[in-house]
From Swiss-Prot:
SUPFAM superfamilies: Hsp33 domain, HSP33 redox switch-like. It is found in: Cytoplasm. Keywords: Chaperone, Cytoplasm, Disulfide bond, Redox-active center, Zinc. Under oxidizing conditions two disulfide bonds are formed involving the reactive cysteines. Under reducing conditions zinc is bound to the reactive cysteines and the protein is inactive. GO terms for biological process: protein refolding. This is 33 kDa chaperonin. Gene3D superfamilies: helix hairpin bin, Hsp33 domain, HSP33 redox switch-like.
């Protein structure tokens, strides 16, 4: 089901410095973020990390050159199993998390403590046409922002500074980066990145791009481009669930229907529920897979 929450305040703003080869992006997500956190009862520490990852995904998707979706994931073996955020070229987003809901999680717990040992960062580019590309690296850094800076330094060899923040009201992010194949005086880059470091989490979550950029760079103001509006949209559908069931096979699916009466699949992102009863399953496979699971002779169905 395609669910959409539109908010004019949910924007990404690009900017560039004309007097130095540095570009940047600012993002602030308000209603979109509140729509996401209402889907589940997230512990505060996980909610904060998910908001930061969502803002990061929107920032990084600004570099998409073709139509498609950028997916950023953090995976672990601890109490937090996964964070995932998706940002598409049509400026739609969705995000969710999976964790051990029986575990105690303090409000101030770090991402590293939640993920445990063996955590990885996964970035996937899923083009509309063509083969997907995926990069997987061990988690490095104390939080999502530093993890992404390390990843981009390794993969793109570009100096980058990222600030991320998430509160109950909004998720925000700021990225400044050297332009590729351009020479930049080290002192100039240090000046820009030092100014970016002075931005507080409260300012990032609470201020729009105009106020953030003035607060940081009023002495050397960048050129600011037209804001791009984002919205929540989930790409789940009954057809995609049907494809998943077909991959599982008639024997397994028929067996589940015999045991449970039907198959129910809930979307992690938007909580849409898809129910397949005996008639649905048999029609999907084109034969009486439920009857076969009961020990009856195999036969096709119309």
């Amino acid at each position: 089901m395609n669910q959409t929450a539109i908010n004019r305040a949910d924007v990404r703003t690009r900017f560039i410095f004309d007097d130095m080869p540095v570009r940047g992006l600012h993002v602030r997500l308000e209603n979109v973020w509140q729509h996401i956190v209402k889907q589940k009862n997230y512990p505060a520490a996980i909610r904060r990390a998910l908001g930061e990852l969502l803002a990061a995904g929107v920032l990084l998707s600004g570099n998409l050159k073709n139509e498609g979706t950028l997916i950023v994931q953090v995976q672990g073996r601890g109490r937090l199993k996964m964070l995932v955020a998706e940002a598409a070229s049509d400026r739609t987003v969705r995000a969710t998390a999976r964790w051990d809901e029986t575990a105690e999680i303090a409000d101030d717990e770090s991402l590293g403590d939640l993920l445990g040992e063996g955590g990885v960062f996964v970035l996937t580019l899923q083009p509309k046409d063509g083969e997907p590309w995926q990069g997987v690296v061990p988690l490095e850094g104390g939080g999502i922002a530093q993890m992404l800076v390390n990843y981009m330094k390794r993969s793109e060899q570009l100096d980058t500074h990222i600030v991320l923040s998430a509160s109950d009201e909004a998720a925000g992010g700021l990225l400044v980066q050297r332009l590729p194949e351009e020479v930049l005086d080290e002192e100039a880059w240090e000046h820009v990145s030092t100014l970016a470091r002075t931005l507080t989490a409260e300012e990032l979550a609470g201020l729009d791009a105009q106020h953030v950029l003035y607060r940081l760079f009023h002495e050397t103001p960048p050129r600011v481009f037209e804001p791009e509006t984002f919205e929540f949209s989930c790409t789940c559908s009954r057809g995609k669930v049907s494809d998943m069931l077909l991959m599982l096979g008639g024997e397994e699916v028929g067996g589940v229907v015999v045991e449970q009466g039907s198959i129910e699949v809930d979307c992690d992102f938007c909580h849409s529920k898809y129910v397949f009863d005996e008639t649905d399953v048999n029609a999907l496979f084109g034969e009486d897979v439920v009857g076969v699971a009961k020990g009856l002779p195999r036969h096709t169905v119309q």
